[in-house]
A protein has these predicted regions:
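Short, Lys/Arg- and Gly-enriched loop/turn segments at beta-strand edges
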Residues: 100-109
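Short pre-catalytic strand/loop immediately N-terminal to key active-site residues, enriched for Gly-Thr
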Residues: 63, 130-139
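Structured surface patches comprising rigid loops and adjacent beta-strands/short helices at the edges
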Residues: 118-126
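Basic/polar N-terminal segments that are highly enriched at the extreme N-terminus
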Residues: 1-10
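Glycine-rich beta-strand-centered segment in the early N-terminal region that forms part
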Residues: 29-46, 58-99
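Mid-domain Rossmann-like dinucleotide-binding core that forms the NAD(H)/NADP(H) cofactor-binding site
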Residues: 92, 136-198
Length: 198
């Protein structure tokens, strides 16, 4: 599959911290993949709780403007940078949004509220055909955060007890799934019974 890639694309950009009124849909240069990077055609992007905090400046982090928001997304590889050999154009991918050296997408490096975005090939996860782009786009930040807590930082083992607060949210649901997959006994708490039904 070969795709003609325009030199310009549409993207959501903001030039200063503020409110949703500071987001603008406009033309910008289409990024080109550097060595060991891929260019992804964004098929679906999702907002998470971090995006409004980034837009408002609540995080206190230095943002290089203009910035494109959104770290949660899924798409198809449109171009390969030099040195990328494990991926093919057209592969359906779901990248982890924290990029080595560059930081969090939509915070310190351009996010995915755009037609195209470049990421290192090392952060790609191949999407199963049965998973929609929309479903996959809702997962990276929540599931990445939960995986880091349960597997990397917590090193949860079979038989251990895990308390998940905020169990009805994205990170909570993902934490429950990862902890159960590791054989832990899970105690879940949420602000209401309707959230525990998730």
């Amino acid at each position: 599959m070969t795709e003609t890639i325009s030199k310009t694309m549409k993207a959501v950009l903001f030039d200063q911290h503020g409110s949703p009124e500071d987001l603008h849909w406009r033309d910008t240069d289409t990024p080109r993949p550097d060595k060991d990077e891929v260019l992804i055609r964004v098929r679906a992007a999702a907002l998470n709780g971090f995006d409004p905090m980034m837009l408002s400046g609540e995080t206190g982090l230095k943002t290089p403007f203009p910035m494109t928001p959104c770290g949660d997304f899924a798409g198809e590889i449109a171009a390969l940078g030099d040195g990328v050999s494990d991926w093919r154009i057209g592969d359906r991918v779901n990248p982890y949004p924290i990029l080595p050296v560059k930081g969090m997408m939509g915070e310190t490096t351009p996010g995915a509220a755009a037609e195209y975005v470049c990421v290192p090939a090392s952060v790609l996860i191949k999407m199963p055909d049965a998973v929609s782009f929309e479903d996959a786009a809702a997962m990276p930040v929540a599931y990445g955060t939960a995986l880091r807590m349960i597997a990397t930082r917590g090193d949860v083992q079979a038989g251990e007890k895990v308390l998940v607060l905020g169990a009805g949210g994205g990170v909570g649901v993902a934490s429950i799934q990862f902890a159960k997959a590791r054989g832990a006994y899970v105690i879940a708490a949420a602000s209401g019974a309707h959230k525990l039904d998730r």
